[in-house]
Amino acid sequence: MAFCNFIKGYEPPCSAIYKNPYREWIGAQIRTDYYGYINPGNPEAAADMAWRDASISHIKNGIYGAMFVAAALSTAAITDNIEDIILSGLAHVPHTSRFYEDVMQVVNGYKNGISCKECFENIHEKYDEYTGYGWCHTNPNAIITVASLLYGEGNYGKSICMAVETGFDTDCNGATVGSIFGMAHGIESIPEYWQRPIKDKLQTSIFGVGTVSISERVAKTLTQMRK
């Protein structure tokens, strides 16, 4: 929608607002991992880059999710403590936002001993994945990501499967959980049986790019990080 608005002459932030029903959807949150990768240990810089990117197409919670993920990934480069990673991500979004409130509700529930089953039931009670707006909104998907990391107990497979099995935007949540988990724990924490089928290939779905080598993308990311 933002691209269409560009063609019509709208620039940010109007490009994110004009006739855009997707402005608080998950689209920005799922494209800002890179800013965390290239800013290890600098969540403020990662969140700033994510904000600049997300503001083109999203507003409010749509932006906050992007900033949260970027900042969390940046912090995951220097610690494997999931709670610290989540709280660092939250430190870079407005504390008066619904996004902050939703994530903190999950974090506090986890700390207070709420079971995994009850946590995910609460998410489904609060948000309806069967509505056109609800299934892809940033907030429910962000808290599914957070809950999966917390209740996954440091197990890669358990964490990503939990994110996918819970519903809503399943592929995006599994990917974000895997991204944060991998940054925090390193590739050695990901069992070989999860890596083998990938065969070092990434299908980008980008016209003119197609399939690329993951290891080559990693090398380019490291080069950018060192600049």
Positions of predicted regions on the chain:
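Acidic, carboxylate-rich catalytic segments that either coordinate divalent cations
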Residues: T96-N122, K126-W135, A184-K227
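Catalytic phosphate/nucleotide-handling subdomain of diverse soluble enzymes
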Residues: H58-S74, I78, I144-K220
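Accessory "access/gating" subregions that flank catalytic or transport cores
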Residues: A2-R23, T32-P43, W51-I56, A70-G167
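Short sequence/structural elements of tandem HEAT/ARM alpha-solenoid repeats
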Residues: E44-D48, D84, E192-R196
